[in-house]
A protein has these predicted regions:
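Conserved glycosyltransferase catalytic-site signature
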Residues: 16, 51, 109-114
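Acidic, PIN/NYN-like endoribonuclease modules and their adjacent C-terminal/linker elements
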Residues: 1-7, 11, 114-149
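Short active-site oxyanion
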Residues: 42-47, 82-84, 121-124
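Short, flexible helix/strand-to-coil boundary loops that buttress conserved ligand/catalytic motifs
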Residues: 23, 61, 100, 136-139
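Short, well-structured N-terminal submotif of metal-dependent ribonuclease cores
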Residues: 1-49, 62-75, 130, 147-149
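Acidic catalytic patch
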Residues: 25, 52-53, 80-103
Length: 149
């Protein structure tokens, strides 16, 4: 755990699973993610994610009719000072199509996340999905590799 050190290259992009792990406090990822969020808050850094993360993160609480968990997701998504939602634009979709065409293991939502990160110029992409390693231009970091602080 913690094979990297801060500061990570800015800007940082997070996949939907990172937001879900954070809000649902999923172990064994939570210790490293707690340190990550402390670091971004202390540095005043903006963390990027796609608006697609709204859909991906709210399905579980809505399906379970868990209003408390839904409210926690909405708070982080819409009220966090250092989380920026990037729109799913036409240029993102065009780039996602290219990624899907050349990386068959990449599913459509993942291609949208990768394209969003690339279009936004994200230097670091934090995810727990190994298939992102196949995307050229992304420096992929797993939660287990984040430094704990």
């Amino acid at each position: 755990m913690g094979s990297l050190s801060y500061p990570l290259s800015d800007p940082v992009y997070i996949d939907a699973n990172i937001l879900i792990y954070t809000v649902e406090r999923v172990q064994p990822h939570m210790d490293a993610l707690r340190g990550f969020w402390r670091w971004t808050n202390a540095q005043g850094l903006v963390v990027l994610t796609s608006e697609l993360t709204v859909l991906e993160s709210l399905v579980g609480p809505l399906k379970a009719n868990n209003r408390r968990l839904e409210a926690r997701f909405r708070r982080l998504l819409y009220q966090s000072a250092n989380l920026r939602l990037i729109p799913v634009s036409r240029s993102v979709l065009e780039r996602a199509a290219q990624l899907r065409a050349h990386t068959p293991a990449l599913k459509t939502p993942d291609a949208i996340h990768a394209a969003t990160a690339l279009e936004a110029g994200a230097a670091t992409f934090i995810t727990n999905d190994a298939q992102f390693q196949q995307v050229s231009g992304l420096m992929v970091v797993a939660p287990r590799d984040l430094p704990t602080i």
